[in-house]
Amino acid sequence: MADNTVILDGSGVKRALTRIAHEVLEKNKGVEGLVLVGIRTGGVFLAQELAERLVEIEGVEVPCGAVDITMYRDDIKGHAEHLPVGKTELPFSIEGKKVVLVDDVLFTGRTIRAAMDALMDQGRASCIQLAVLVDRGHRDLPIRADFVGRNVPTSRSENIVVAFDAGNKPTEVILQK
């Protein structure tokens, strides 16, 4: 049986997202030209939560979309026809926008690389910034998050899970040993 440790409870997750929202606003000097794009699936829910925090702070809605990376992954050669493909939903152009790419856990960097490739196929953003709830280290690629909720050094055999409730609200972050 796996040994589970709660790293962040619900209120800890909320505080981390609120802090990330403030950091995003500070770095970008407000919300002008800003869009949020979550990586399916957990990143989408966190992007929506981040958008809610930005409304609470600034009183302005920031466009929020979703990107599916299935066809951009580097580990599917020869298996692509067997993978379920989600939908990229960007109800706005990213052309010239400041894109904040959102994911739940940053590990090797391969998911982020795939997401950036998918975004670049959608247009030329003025910049892409990365916000993650948890950074657990162990990069295979030179990827670094601009905004991090919590750094949690792990071994490669451990796992980090962000749990969501039925309404897709993050409830806790769990370290599985």
Curated annotation (Swiss-Prot):
Motif (PRPP-binding): 99-111
Cysteine disulfide partners in this protein: none
Molecular-function annotations in GO: uracil phosphoribosyltransferase activity
InterPro entries: PRibTrfase_dom, PRTase-like, PyrR, PyrR_bifunctional
CDD domains: PRTases_typeI
Family named by the database record: Belongs to the purine/pyrimidine phosphoribosyltransferase family. PyrR subfamily.
Function: Regulates the transcription of the pyrimidine nucleotide (pyr) operon in response to exogenous pyrimidines.
Protein name, entry field: Bifunctional protein PyrR
Source lineage: Bacteria, Pseudomonadati, Thermodesulfobacteriota, Desulfuromonadia, Geobacterales
